[in-house]
């Protein structure tokens, strides 16, 4: 049983902490992931202490040397945690004292774990956002490249899960790529709000010892210094925003996965997943299950739960730091790991997906050209509302006769409107249908080519300004 007096905070305590409480209170099992960020923060802070005259140059060098050795131990996997290590800060400071002795006790001068932990988190999440951005842009590039190659393939577009209009397969791919581009842009904006220095704020009131926060900012490469010490040490809106960002990104990935799951069924047979991203059944040997996509879809729910759970934690807190905020790190780590894995799996699925061109084209049907009948009449000078009504009557007539739209005779069509003539036969061509949507953003080939080019330009600019 550990003595409370031996803790970093143990001066006013006597006796020992209950072992169950000690385990309950400990966070080192997961916050050790921030070991590098914690060391970087301490390296910067001791330089600020030296500038303020609170440690000598010799003491600073001893501390920096000790921190370098701790960094090496963590890097090599030889750092040994003890039961007394409450968190990553305690562990690193304990080890520093073992290595260099008394000067280690000066490192925490004027610093609280309140500003230390939030500095660690901002450093860790800043780097993690860069990694997520890289995985996200790789997925987008995979999608754009695929769209460029398969631009001539047509298949049904759906609304309300009903066949709607013919579109290009590439148009569907790019619809998801564009949404992910916005996610990448949002991640860049989020990183700006993460990249604010809290170190030097103390526990609540600030730092009274002349620590140069601008020096800290430069050392740790933050964009700015926090404005208010109470806000700096207690606010976790940047974590909440990260969790929301992840929830929205996962929503987009879940929707894409749902589409592909449907398209991969025998009833649709538009796509086939690679064996590398599928599994089978323990009972039914014919099964090829889209587990990769189903897991992506399910992971969205996991991320939503982390986001809503953390917001519920925050909404009940009074001002400044409370131990409830220990919940922030597990949510942050879990969501990062989840989204990072999902993006990599999604890239693999998209890059190896096999498409059934014949199946896609076979699924196109004349009833999907009903809107084109209305457009035909509009081009003949008829108001759209009237044209829409008459195209509905064309559909009704075909259903009454039990035939497809394109099997109606010219006489049948003329019985509905005298504007129909021999050129109506062009309406029954699916390529003609998609090629009429030439306004920017449409599914005509020229428009889809433009989308590909624009996204490739975006990718190039994004690569040049990596967050």
Curated annotation (Swiss-Prot):
2-(N(omega)-L-arginino)succinate binds at residues 27, 114, 159, 289, 321, 326, 329. One of its GO terms (cellular component) is cytosol. The keyword Lyase applies. Pathway: Amino-acid biosynthesis; L-arginine biosynthesis; L-arginine from L-ornithine and carbamoyl phosphate: step 3/3; Nitrogen metabolism; urea cycle; L-arginine and fumarate from (N(omega)-L-arginino)succinate: step 1/1. The active site is at 160 (proton acceptor), 281 (proton donor). Keywords: Amino-acid biosynthesis, Arginine biosynthesis, Lyase, Urea cycle. Gene3D superfamilies: Fumarase/aspartase (C-terminal domain), Fumarase/aspartase (Central domain), Fumarase/aspartase (N-terminal domain). The record marks 294 as: Increases basicity of active site His. Pfam families: ASL_C2, Lyase_1. It comes from the Eukaryota. InterPro entries: Arg_succ_lyase_C (IPR029419), Argininosuccinate_lyase (IPR009049), Fumarase/histidase_N (IPR024083), Fumarate_lyase_CS (IPR020557), Fumarate_lyase_fam (IPR000362), Fumarate_lyase_N (IPR022761), L-Aspartase-like (IPR008948). PROSITE patterns: FUMARATE_LYASES. It catalyses: 2-(N(omega)-L-arginino)succinate = fumarate + L-arginine. Transmembrane segments: none annotated. GO terms for biological process: arginine biosynthetic process via ornithine; L-arginine biosynthetic process; urea cycle. It is an enzyme of class 4 (lyase). Its EC number is 4.3.2.1. One of its GO terms (molecular function) is argininosuccinate lyase activity. Belongs to the lyase 1 family. Argininosuccinate lyase subfamily. PANTHER family: ARGININOSUCCINATE LYASE (PTHR43814:SF1). Homotetramer. This is Argininosuccinate lyase.
């Amino acid at each position: 049983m550990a003595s409370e007096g031996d803790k970093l905070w143990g001066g006013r305590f006597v006796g020992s902490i209950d072992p169950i409480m000690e385990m309950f209170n400990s966070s080192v099992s997961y916050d050790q992931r921030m070991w590098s960020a914690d060391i970087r923060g301490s390296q910067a802070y001791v330089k600020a202490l030296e500038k303020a005259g609170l440690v000598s140059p010799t003491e600073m060098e001893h501390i920096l040397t000790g921190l370098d050795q701790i960094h090496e131990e963590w890097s090599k996997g030889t750092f040994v945690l003890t039961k007394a290590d409450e968190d990553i800060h305690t562990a690193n400071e304990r080890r520093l004292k073992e290595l260099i002795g008394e000067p280690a006790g000066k490192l925490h001068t004027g610093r609280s774990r309140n500003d230390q932990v939030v500095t660690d988190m901002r450093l860790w999440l800043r780097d993690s956002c860069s990694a997520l951005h890289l995985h996200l842009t790789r997925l987008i590039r995979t999608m754009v490249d695929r769209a460029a190659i398969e631009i001539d393939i047509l298949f049904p577009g759906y609304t309300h899960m009903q066949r709607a209009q013919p579109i290009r397969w590439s148009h569907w791919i790019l619809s998801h790529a564009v949404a992910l581009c916005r996610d990448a842009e949002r991640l860049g904006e989020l990183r700006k709000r993460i990249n604010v220095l809290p170190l030097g704020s103390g526990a609540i009131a600030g730092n009274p010892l002349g620590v140069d926060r601008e020096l800290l900012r430069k050392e740790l490469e933050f964009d700015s210094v926090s404005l208010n010490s109470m806000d700096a040490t207690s606010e976790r809106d940047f974590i909440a925003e990260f969790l929301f960002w992840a929830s929205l990104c996962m929503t987009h990935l879940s929707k894409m996965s749902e589409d592909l799951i449907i398209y991969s069924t025998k009833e649709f047979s538009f796509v086939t997943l690679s064996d590398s991203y599928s599994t089978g059944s323990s009972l039914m040997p014919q099964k090829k299950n889209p587990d990769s996509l189903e897991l992506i879809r399910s992971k969205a729910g996991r991320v939503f739960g982390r986001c809503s759970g953390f917001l519920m934690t925050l909404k009940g807190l009074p001002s400044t730091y409370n131990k409830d905020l220990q919940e922030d790190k597990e949510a942050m780590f879990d969501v990062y790991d989840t989204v990072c894995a999902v993006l990599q799996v999604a890239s693999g699925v998209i890059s190896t997906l096999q498409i059934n061109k014949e199946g896609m084209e076979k699924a196109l049907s004349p009833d999907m050209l009903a809107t084109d009948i209305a457009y035909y009449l509009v081009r003949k000078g008829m108001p759209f509302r009237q044209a829409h009504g008459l195209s509905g009557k064309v559909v009704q007539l075909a259903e009454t006769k039990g035939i497809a739209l394109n099997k109606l005779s010219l006489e049948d069509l003329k019985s509905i409107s005298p504007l129909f003539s021999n050129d109506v036969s062009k309406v029954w061509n699916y390529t003609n249908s998609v090629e009429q949507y030439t306004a920017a953003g449409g599914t005509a080939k020229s428009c889809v080519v433009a989308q590909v080019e624009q996204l490739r330009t975006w990718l190039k600019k994004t690569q040049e300004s990596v967050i």
